[in-house]
């Protein structure tokens, strides 16, 4: 499974159980990255993808319980740590600015960054994509 998350410069993930920001081009990018599999997300995140032609989206509140090894999971407002054991890849999208946050996440030991790229968002001048793979023991 591949997990997608968004973080700010201070590794902030959410504030008061809400996403820190949103970006239309980021959602289009996530849809394109996941087009060869199922893209799972909660029903709140699904609204971000309205108007994007992505027939592979499965939105349900307990989506992580149904995730399969080849699925892509867009996780907002929740700590991904409990799900990392089932994941083979982790993609972090960085907003490249700081937002208020009360939920933080740092990529733990055992994950190796294999790629870093940047692209222009619709509401963010630069979004950084960091791709990680789980290290083999």
What are these regions (language model features)?
Residues 1-137:
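Enzymes that bind and transform nitrogen-containing heteroaromatic metabolites
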